[in-house]
Amino acid sequence: MATFNSFRKAVGAIKDSTTVSIAKVNSEFKDLDVAIVKATNHVESAPKERHIRRIFSATSVVQPRADVAYCIHALAKRLSKTRNWVVAIKVLIVIHRTLREGDPTFREELLNYSHRGHILRISNFKDDTSPLAWDCSAWIRTYALFLEERLECYRVLKYDIEAERLPKGSGASSKNVDFNASQTYRTRMLSDEELLEQLPALQQLLYRLIGCQPEGSAYSNYLIQYALALVLKESFKIYCAINDGIINLVDMFFEMSRHDAVKALNIYKRAGQQAENLADFYEYCKGLELARNFQFPTLRQPPPSFLATMEDYIKEAPQSGSVQKKLEYQEKEEEEQEEEEAEHSVQPEEPAEADNQKENSEGDQPLIEEEEEDQEKIEEEDAKPSFLIDTDDLLGLNEINPKAAEIEDRNALALAIYPPGHEAPGPSNILSLIETGGSGWELALVTPQNNNNNNNPRPAPNTKLAGGFDNLLLDSLYEDDSARRQIQLTNAGYGHGGIDTTAAPPNPFQMQQDPFAMSNNIAPPTNVQMAMQQQQQQQMTMMHQSPYNYTHPHDYHQNHHHHQFSAGPSPSNPFGDAFLALPPPPGSAGPQQNNHHHMLL
């Protein structure tokens, strides 16, 4: 195993010397390439300070941005090509130290480059040459995630946490750090919206930092502890910034809306949980060799009673806006209402003319009496339209159109119907109807119904239907129709009694006859009669020719007599079915004869 490690070191030294030689010959940035190769060589030791300082000077603000971009490109190329965990962790250490101690231009260029090339995303990196290399590879991947989150936090905050300097006598140099108001960070002076945006980014950075906990063989490795020391130095300031932000957030918590208060409560809960995890992380790191150079702070947990108070506030918090603004609006409304009531309750008095002249001379305003002002205000309030909207008649059915009313008044067809209690224009129309034999429905249309009975003390029932139509008028029309039908049946021979020669004219509105039916009272034209005779002759010929149409002479005489009797007053329909007039078979002569006699009666 020792031979294998020695062989790997020799191969790594050869690669480094070859790379340095190539950089001196072909590279335009010879000094920078040589410094990068020597700072990230295969030797398992920390990078030398002079090589790191050379990289700092190459990425300073006085250098062109192209030189800074080339340095980042060279480091990214070195990290992507290597499969050795020593070279990988040295590249990350150089990047981390340049972020902490270098010029801000390096952070800006690295942030722009990371969006294009993803320099720190090495989730597939592994070195399985030995168990130590395997454990160190796992920690290197976690370390790269922390550096990537550090860049993301810088993008959100627009400033670097490491650039925020603690006051003298605080920070990592003190043994028991008390996070009070004396240690002011930028998060202590932010608004609630900025806090709700920046505190989650800081908490995510602290989460990645706590994840940088070495395990296995990497716990006692010198290079791992060297990089872990850089992480621990940043943990103090990150937690101080979060703690100041939480204090500022708590001060504004009871003025937030419910949506913002829920976010603030989640941040507050996560801060308490991360304080416990960070305390455990410090306890774990105290067993390392680097613990002799660090004095870990004492972290204080937030009281649980205050957490319950915040949860109770969320249940009663407003949906939007702040409570303070809402209270201010309510106070303003109450003051305005009180002023209006005072103006209406106090009766105005006529001021003296001397006082009015004195005031007007001082303010250069015309004379205006208070009574006139109050009267004008009252008139303006009365003149304001009411905002109540009647939603009962949305279609405007109850509104009266003046044009429609005028047309109804001029309508000559509506003169026959009058409401009860209204006198007709004249009796000429009624007398003419009576003289011409009008009855029933004609008189009911023009004669007003008198429902007042002097003998009956009870009030007459309301016989009015919807639209002003009289119920008695409707009943009289039905009675008249039934009487006319009875008279028609009696005249046709279906009822008892004789024929009424003084029958009233039929109601034209109740006619149920077919307008295209043939009349029995009017003789048809000559051509129709000739067609009917030809049809009757054809029927008789068919009756004689049929072998099954044998009838007795008496039956034939009766049938022939019945045919002549029925054909006399009412000729048959020439468009009807000719086979309906055929005589029945011999077996059914008796019933058919009885039916004929019944029809004659």
UniProtKB/Swiss-Prot annotation:
Annotated GO MF terms: 1-phosphatidylinositol binding; clathrin binding
The UniProt keywords, alphabetically, are: Coated pit, Cytoplasmic vesicle, Endocytosis, Golgi apparatus, Membrane
Kindly list the GO CC terms recorded for this protein: clathrin-coated pit; clathrin-coated vesicle; cytosol; Golgi apparatus
Q: Which Gene3D superfamilies match?
A: 1.25.40.90, ANTH domain
Q: Where is the composition biased (Acidic residues)?
A: 331-342, 367-382
Q: One biological-process term from Gene Ontology?
A: clathrin-dependent endocytosis
Q: Which residues form the ENTH domain?
A: 24-161
Give the principal location in a single coarse category: membrane
What this protein is called in its record is: Putative clathrin assembly protein At4g25940
